[in-house]
From Swiss-Prot:
Protein name (database record): Intermembrane transport protein PqiA
Complex and partners: May form a complex composed of PqiA, PqiB and PqiC.
Species annotation: Escherichia coli (strain K12)
Disulfide bridge positions per record: none
GO BP term, pick one: membrane organization
Induction: By paraquat.
Length: 417
């Protein structure tokens, strides 16, 4: 049945392109795509107060985390302690400015910027509309790049690695950092993209009938990748957020494969070159990713060895294989099993960033283990190569258009008549 209702009552699924008529949602309810199961929108209770409270609390915890010592270590009576702000400083001093920059961006600056942006937007700060649109656009683009919780996991892994050399303690800022990780995740979770954009600017009018259960491409429609507005397929710029777009991402497979090949080329030196060098009583011992896993396993740290093996070796390898498989299927060589491809894509998107855990482990070890001739740990070129592998695979997954996997799938079972 064709409907002439305002486009605000409908949404195009960003994952499978199905047009869905949104039901009336009570507080706490969510609408999901009947075709692929993707969450389309969530009706949060107190949509302004909740993210505001979480964001303010998270920013306060972030401030406390940077004011006091974070972790400390004692080896043979020699004590070393660091603050969070000292970690990038050490990396810069060791001529690994790129790793220090990654730490500052992904662990500190990106989460802080996103939290401040949430406060400004959900509370309707007196800002020019164009600036609000730009902030909202950047907010959802940067969301994936906030890695505070991954850094926390890296710190815990570092503790296990260092317990064989001395006693490890946490400083006054460790608990605030743990709280910050939880609060900032909750602040992001309580901001619904569709609600936020509707609050910034109204949905553009659409002067053509809408048919729920039919894909947008069959109706001559496309979804704005930024603000979820439903637009005519031939309209290149969204009138609400000014984002350029197309029915399908232009050259999606070409970009995805190019970035995938780049990550594969970087992955080889990342596993061959040392990721860190341990200077113990004047004896320098370079260590690769696999050597670190073997050492942890031989010392009986089986859970940590398994975590590092999964995050640093299995996940990047399987992610690259999965992305190649998605591209192969999107080219029409698969068995039209779109649901399986969609599940693979969701897993790839979720787990890919967690491979940064090994990079953060090296950052913590390099900053904390500074004990002169007794013991010191330095980052090595393999760590930079591995960080670039993770970043390239993340970009590769982002440039892939998941709707390509659904374009060959029949949709008659979802069409309303």
């Amino acid at each position: 049945m064709c409907e002439h209702h305002h486009a605000a009552k409908h949404i195009l699924c960003s994952q499978c392109d199905m047009l869905v008529a949104l039901p009336r949602l009570e507080h706490g309810q969510k609408a999901a795509c009947p075709r692929c199961g993707t969450t389309l929108t969530v009706a949060w209770d107190a949509p302004r107060q909740r993210p505001t409270a979480y964001a303010l609390a998270a920013l306060f915890m972030l401030l406390l985390s940077n004011l006091f010592p974070f972790v400390n270590m004692n080896v043979a009576g020699v004590t070393s302690e660091i603050t969070l702000l000292e970690i990038p400083g050490v990396l810069f001093s060791e001529d690994y400015a790129s790793l220090g920059t990654f730490f500052l961006l992904f662990v500190q600056l990106v989460p802080a910027f996103c939290l401040i942006t949430i406060l400004l937007l959900v509370n309707r700060a007196e800002l020019p509309v164009r600036l609000k649109e730009q902030l909202a656009r950047v907010l959802f683009q940067l969301k994936t790049w906030g890695m505070a919780e991954i850094f926390l996991a890296g710190v815990l892994v570092s503790f296990v690695k260092l317990m064989a050399y001395g006693s490890i303690g946490v400083g006054s800022s460790f608990l605030p950092w743990c709280l910050f990780c939880v609060l900032q995740l909750r602040a992001f979770q309580c901001v619904d993209r569709r609600w936020l954009w509707d609050d910034i600017a109204p949905m553009p009018e659409l002067r053509q009938p809408l048919k729920p259960g039919v894909t947008g491409i069959r109706q001559g429609l496309r979804s704005c990748s930024c603000c979820t507005a439903i637009l005519p397929a031939d309209e290149p710029v969204c009138p609400r957020c000014s984002t350029k777009g197309y029915v399908r991402r232009r050259n999606s497979l070409q970009w995805t494969l190019a970035l995938l090949v780049t990550s594969i080329m970087l992955y080889l030196p990342a596993n061959i070159l040392p990721i860190m060098v341990t200077d113990l009583l004047g004896s320098k011992m370079p260590s690769t990713i696999l050597a670190g896993v073997i050492l942890l396993w031989s010392e009986g740290s089986y859970p940590v060895a398994a975590v590092i093996f999964l995050a640093s070796i299995m996940v990047p390898t399987l992610k690259m294989i999965a992305i190649a498989w998605l591209c192969w299927d999107a080219k029409g060589h698969g068995k039209r099993d779109s649901e399986r491809m969609h599940l693979i894509y969701e897993v790839v998107e979720f787990v890919g960033r967690w491979s940064m855990i090994d990079v953060f482990v090296i950052a913590v070890l390099s900053a904390l283990v500074r004990m002169g001739g007794l013991m010191s740990i330095y980052p090595a070129m393999g760590a930079l190569m591995f960080a670039l592998v993770v970043i390239m695979t993340m970009f590769s997954a982002m440039t892939f258009d998941p709707r390509l996997s659904w374009d060959r799938q029949p949709e008659s079972e979802h069409e309303e008549s």
